[in-house]
């Protein structure tokens, strides 16, 4: 099973922490892929940031789906 974790802000350091935590508890047959958008807010602190990040998250899911997709997506925020 492949699960894609999406950190909706652009912090690569936070994305790496999220991935490490998920891998610690994932089963042996679970592949964890963690991503964050290249463009968007560095932190989600307002309604504007949330709306901006939501578009970036949708684009990440669409791109992943077009490339073969994952079995599930987890948005690590909101």
Specify the residue positions occupied by each region the protein language model found.
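N-terminal glycine-rich anion-binding loop in soluble enzyme alpha/beta folds
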Residues: 1-56
């Amino acid at each position: 099973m492949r699960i894609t974790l999406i950190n909706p802000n652009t912090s690569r350091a936070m994305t790496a922490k999220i991935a490490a935590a998920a891998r610690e508890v994932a089963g042996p047959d679970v592949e964890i892929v963690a991503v964050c958008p290249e463009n968007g807010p560095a932190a989600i602190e307002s309604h504007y940031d949330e709306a901006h990040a939501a578009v970036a998250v949708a684009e990440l899911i669409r791109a992943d789906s077009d490339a073969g997709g994952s079995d599930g997506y987890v948005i690590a925020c909101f």
